[in-house]
Regions:
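Acidic, proline/glycine-enriched N-terminal capping motif
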Residues: 1-57, 61-68
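Short amphipathic beta-strand starts and helix->beta connectors
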Residues: 6-15, 58-70, 100-101, 125-134, ...
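Catalytic strand-loop segment that frames the active site of acyl-thioester-processing enzymes
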Residues: 7, 13-22, 166-192
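Acidic, low-complexity central loop/insert segments
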Residues: 18-20, 26-27, 69-175
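Residue-level signal for inorganic ion chemistry
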Residues: 32, 82, 120, 206, ...
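Short, conserved charged micro-motifs
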Residues: 34-39, 89-93, 122-125, 150-156, ...
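A common structural junction motif
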Residues: 46-47, 97-106, 154-164, 243-248, ...
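Glycine-rich, small/acidic residue-mixed loop/short-helix segments
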Residues: 71, 168, 185, 191-197, ...
Length: 298
C-alpha cells in the first residue's frame, strides 16, 4: 500500500477508529478451585476489579520488581485466560509453574485464536457493534476483540494495514514487548504504573520494590515520544544525543506518520534530560533535530 493510502487510513483511524487482525499471541488458561487466590498473589492488579466481558492489563514481576511478563487477564467461565507476547511462552509458563505449591491450579497452553480488534466508533457503531466480544484497550482507546472464522462478517471489514497500527501505537507512546519492554525493565520506566498496577492491594512478587519507587517518585529513565521532521535516517537502536554530544537515550521504535511525513520515535531518556536533542543520520552524516512531544506518554 502506498503512503498516500496509508495516510488516509491513519487519519480515519484517529477520528473513527478501525479494525485490525491481532498477530499471534500467547494464551494461557488457569483453572482449578485455587486459581483466583493463586493468580491474585502473582499479578500487579486487584483481580476483584475484573469485570465479566472485560480484560484487565497487569504485569508479572520478578522479586526485584523487574518485568517478567505484561498481561491481559479475563474470565472465561470459572477459568482465567492470560494473554502475553508469544516470545516469552517458555519463560512465562515456567514462572507460573514455579509458584504453585499445593494449589489446585491447572495451567494449560491454549491454541492460537484468530481475533480481530476493533476500536473507536467502529467498535461500537455500524456492522461490527452487534457482535459479542471482549472489551479491551489495545491502542489506548476503548475497543473490542472478536474471534473470527471463515465466512464471519468481520472478515468482510476493511482491516488496517499493520504499518498504520504500528504508527498509532507509537504516537500514543504504547510500549511493546521486544521493543520497549523486556526483562530488565522496571514498569514505571515505561509508564506501566499508570495502566498495569494497583497500589492499594496486597503483596505479590516485586511489590515492595514497586511501592518504594512510588514513594520516591522517580526512576532513572522514562519513555518519551520524540518527533523529527520528514525524512529518513532514524531507526531503532539509534542513539539520541544532547547538545553537548552525550548520549541521553536510545530509540526503541520508529514510525513515519504517513499523513504528515513526520517521523516519530519512542525512546527511553535519562531523567532530567531536556531539549535540544538530535541524532545523526548514519547514511548522510547529517544531524536530525528531535523534539519531545507534548503527547509523550510518561
Amino acid at each position: 500500500m502506498d503512503e498516500e493510502k496509508l495516510g488516509e487510513q491513519l487519519r480515519l483511524a484517529r477520528s473513527e477508529g478501525g479494525c485490525f487482525l491481532l498477530p499471534r499471541r500467547l494464551l494461557i488458561r488457569l483453572s482449578g478451585t485455587d486459581a483466583f487466590r493463586y493468580l491474585h498473589g502473582q499479578v500487579t492488579r486487584d483481580l476483584t476489579r475484573l469485570v465479566p466481558g472485560e480484560a484487565l492489563a497487569a504485569c508479572i514481576l520478578t522479586p526485584k520488581g523487574k518485568l517478567a511478563a505484561p498481561l491481559l487477564i479475563w474470565r472465561e467461565g470459572e477459568d482465567f485466560l492470560l494473554e502475553s507476547a508469544s516470545e516469552i511462552e517458555e519463560a512465562l509458563l515456567a514462572r507460573l509453574e514455579r509458584y504453585i505449591v499445593a494449589d489446585d491450579v491447572s495451567i494449560t497452553l491454549e491454541k492460537p485464536r484468530q481475533v480481530v480488534h476493533c476500536f473507536g466508533k467502529v467498535a461500537f457503531e455500524g456492522s461490527t457493534s452487534n457482535q459479542a466480544g471482549l472489551h479491551v484497550s489495545r491502542l489506548g482507546m476503548p475497543g473490542v476483540d472478536r474471534e473470527v472464522g471463515e465466512g464471519d462478517s468481520l472478515c468482510q471489514v476493511s482491516l488496517l494495514d499493520p504499518a498504520v497500527v504500528e504508527a498509532l501505537r507509537i504516537e500514543r507512546s504504547l510500549p511493546a514487548w521486544g521493543s520497549e519492554l523486556n526483562g530488565e525493565l522496571l514498569p514505571p520506566e515505561a509508564g506501566l504504573d499508570l495502566t498495569h498496577i494497583d497500589y492499594d492491594r496486597g503483596c505479590y512478587p516485586g511489590q515492595e520494590i514497586i511501592s518504594r519507587i512510588k514513594s520516591v517518585g522517580k526512576v532513572n529513565r522514562n519513555l518519551h515520544l520524540l518527533v523529527a521532521a520528514p525524512g529518513g535516517g532514524l531507526h531503532p537502536g539509534q542513539a539520541v544525543l544532547s547538545a553537548d554530544g552525550t548520549e541521553s537515550g536510545v530509540m526503541t521504535s520508529v514510525s513515519t506518520q504517513f499523513d504528515t511525513g513526520s517521523v516519530l520515535a519512542l525512546c527511553f531518556l535519562k531523567r532530567g534530560v531536556e531539549e535540544p536533542l538530535f541524532a545523526f543520520d548514519p547514511l548522510t552524516g547529517l544531524k536530525r533535530d528531535l523534539t519531545i512531544s507534548r503527547n509523550s506518554g510518561t
